[in-house]
Amino acid sequence: MELKVTTLEGKEAGSVQLSDEIFGLDPRVDIIQRCVNWQLAKRQAGTHKAKGRAEVWRTGKKMYKQKGTGGARHGSQRVPQFRGGGRAFGPVVRSHAFDLPKKVRALALKHALSAKAKDGGLIVIESATLEAAKTKALVGHFSGLGLTSALIIDGAELNNGFAVAARNIPNIDVLPIQGINVYDILRRQKLVLTKAAVDALEARFK
């Protein structure tokens, strides 16, 4: 697959050949969904907690005598049916994370990249560098490229000027190649890769 390369200013800068094994797959929604669910489950705090009947503060004394009242045979006031009683099967502090094989994660990333390429949401730029960290200048560049919602992936190290300038622009995310992931690719309309990012991806999946 061949794709045009543009500069940050919107000028043409040749073309790049993309591997069909990474960008030319027929997207599998089920594999992508598995990876997104894995990511979202892994980042859940899991700090939810409700007190059970063993944890609430209530007296342990029997409420009233066993017989002769005409009422139910209650003992503890800590049971769930009473106000102030413990919650039955309430949430506990736990990890929501589950395992997903590394090969499935790698495949999901390929399918997410292929989905963006298929939908026309993939853009390759020559480099993501700015001499001065000026947000106004970067907004102008993005406007020229038609970017309102985008994930920008650079090489192993981000250009400091570019990263700082992009930090305050809504719906724009900037990540190094090590941080590329399925969820962030899907949550933005466009995926912008630098030539360094393309080379790193092809080296990673070689």
UniProtKB/Swiss-Prot annotation:
- Which superkingdom, per the lineage? Bacteria
What is this protein's record name? Large ribosomal subunit protein uL4
Lineage of the species this protein comes from: Bacteria, Pseudomonadati, Pseudomonadota, Alphaproteobacteria, Hyphomicrobiales
Q: Name one GO cellular component term.
A: ribonucleoprotein complex
* Keyword Ribosomal protein applies: yes
Q: Name the GO terms of the biological process aspect.
A: translation
Q: Which GO molecular function entries does the Swiss-Prot or TrEMBL record give?
A: rRNA binding; structural constituent of ribosome
Q: Which organism is it from?
A: Rhodopseudomonas palustris (strain BisB18)
Subunit note: Part of the 50S ribosomal subunit.
Question: What keyword terms does UniProt attach to this protein?
Answer: Ribonucleoprotein, Ribosomal protein, RNA-binding, rRNA-binding
- Family, per the entry? Belongs to the universal ribosomal protein uL4 family.
Known role: One of the primary rRNA binding proteins, this protein initially binds near the 5'-end of the 23S rRNA. It is important during the early stages of 50S assembly. It makes multiple contacts with different domains of the 23S rRNA in the assembled 50S subunit and ribosome.
Cited HAMAP family: Ribosomal_uL4_B
* InterPro entries per the UniProt record, alphabetical: Ribosomal_uL4 (IPR002136), Ribosomal_uL4-like (IPR013005), Ribosomal_uL4_dom_sf (IPR023574)
Could you tell me which Gene3D superfamilies the record lists for this protein? 3.40.1370.10
Aminoacyl-tRNA synthetase recorded as keyword:
no
